[in-house]
């Protein structure tokens, strides 16, 4: 029998998506095949301390904060120099813990923006999902759109503002530019619709700008697209494949954080999408093209708008899509014939394959210094 792989699932973090990260991690831990994997959880509390939970059943039964308080979660630090045992106890014994592959499920700031990926690269650990560069590009929504537009990928138009930019007259200029008073003001580098606000008047615009700047130092303004919200899951490294699309049908004014996670009736999600074959294929191809354009690997969810005249527009790329029991990424693959346990197997395989390919690259270039 093959030796079990040690998988460390990372969750929590210091972003506004902390709680969603925990929900996603619980679903992953519950779904991973215990016959194949030894599973541990690395929980990052709000203030940034790291804890190891090496009994997955306790993680599933209790909140990780509860395990920290009662002492079941061990405080750890990062141990460089031995990639096979990257986690070191802070309890005084200095014990080190194994990881063959890390499954990051830390959404948002410091989880999806390349910071965590950079740490895992320094530890020389295989990890699931996009690398440092791709994570950073996709976290910055204006940068994502700049890259995609340069590559010919259709995107929703946008305008970026920083706190230094004068906002007087901006609303009217954008109204003239897009021909609509209905706009969205959103943080450049947050997800889950945190700090995303619809506006219809200049007063609402000014108020929304002030609110969003409480969360981010840059914001984007976009015209509101009255169309269908379609998503497509992408899986792979060099030769990615796309799932059947899914659709979000919000029951609120828009697909807000509350509609996503707090209101059980906030939206209907479906993988039975009424789209023509040609539009479906177009969405799948654009999703793959966008994935490649930003050099993603492992997984990503590409979010679209489809207008009433079937114009397909990319809204954003999510490199650590949710894995809760209602999340669309695993549901779209399930509908495409890939059950979640097999999906997780493939993601771990892809992470290890990429790491092995990276290890083949020459990292040292030795030359003899010319004598003077």
UniProtKB/Swiss-Prot annotation:
Q: Which SUPFAM superfamilies match?
A: Glutathione synthetase ATP-binding domain-like, PreATP-grasp domain
Report the gene name: ddl
The pathway it acts in is: Cell wall biogenesis; peptidoglycan biosynthesis
The root-end lineage is: Bacteria, Pseudomonadati, Pseudomonadota, Gammaproteobacteria, Legionellales
Domain called ATP-grasp: residue spans = 145-349
The protein's matches in InterPro entries, at most eight in alphabetical order, are given as:
ATP-grasp (IPR011761), ATP_grasp_subdomain_1 (IPR013815), D-Ala_lig_Van_CS (IPR000291), D_ala_D_ala (IPR005905), Dala_Dala_lig_C (IPR011095), Dala_Dala_lig_N (IPR011127), PreATP-grasp_dom_sf (IPR016185)
Q: Which HAMAP family match?
A: Dala_Dala_lig
Q: What is its EC number?
A: 6.3.2.4
**In its UniProt entry, what is this protein called?**
D-alanine--D-alanine ligase
Q: Which UniProt keywords apply?
A: ATP-binding, Cell shape, Cell wall biogenesis/degradation, Cytoplasm, Ligase, Magnesium, Manganese, Metal-binding, Nucleotide-binding, Peptidoglycan synthesis
Binding sites annotated in the UniProt record for Mg(2+) 2? 316, 318
Q: One MF term in GO for this entry?
A: metal ion binding
Protein localization = Cytoplasm
């Amino acid at each position: 029998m093959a030796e079990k792989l040690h998988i460390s699932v990372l969750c929590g973090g210091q972003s506004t998506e902390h709680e969603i990260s925990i929900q996603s991690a619980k679903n992953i831990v519950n779904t991973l095949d215990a016959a194949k994997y030894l599973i541990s959880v690395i929980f990052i509390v709000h203030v940034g301390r790291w804890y190891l939970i090496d009994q997955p059943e306790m993680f599933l039964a209790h909140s990780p904060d509860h395990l920290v308080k009662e002492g079941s979660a061990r405080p750890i630090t990062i141990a460089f120099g031995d990639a096979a045992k990257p986690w070191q106890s802070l309890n005084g014994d200095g014990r080190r813990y194994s990881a063959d592959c890390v499954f990051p499920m830390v959404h948002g700031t410091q989880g999806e923006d390349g910071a965590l990926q950079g740490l895992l690269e320094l530890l020389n650990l295989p990890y699931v999902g996009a690398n440092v560069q791709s994570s950073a590009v996709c976290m910055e929504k204006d940068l994502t759109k700049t890259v995609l537009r340069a590559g010919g990928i259709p995107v929703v138009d946008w305008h970026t503002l920083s706190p230094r930019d004068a906002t007087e007259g901006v609303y009217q200029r954008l109204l003239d530019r897009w021909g609509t008073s209905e706009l969205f003001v959103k943080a450049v580098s947050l997800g889950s619709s945190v700090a995303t606000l619809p506006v219809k008047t200049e007063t609402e615009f000014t108020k929304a700008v002030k609110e969003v700047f409480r969360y981010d130092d840059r914001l984007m303004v976009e015209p509101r697209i009255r169309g269908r919200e379609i998503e497509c899951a992408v899986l792979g490294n060099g030769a990615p494949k796309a799932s059947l699309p899914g659709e979000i049908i919000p029951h609120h004014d828009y697909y807000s954080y509350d509609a996503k996670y707090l209101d059980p009736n906030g939206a209907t999600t479906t993988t039975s999408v009424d789209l023509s074959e040609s539009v479906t294929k177009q969405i799948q191809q654009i999703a793959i093209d966008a994935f490649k354009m930003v050099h993603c690997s492992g997984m990503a969810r590409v979010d679209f708008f489809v207008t009433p005249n079937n114009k397909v527009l990319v809204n954003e790329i999510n490199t650590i899509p949710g894995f809760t029991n209602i999340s669309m990424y695993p549901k779209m693959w399930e509908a495409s014939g890939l059950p979640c346990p097999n999906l997780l197997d493939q993601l771990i395989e892809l992470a290890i394959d990429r790491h092995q390919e990276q290890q083949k690259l020459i990292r040292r270039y030795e030359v003899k210094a010319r004598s003077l």
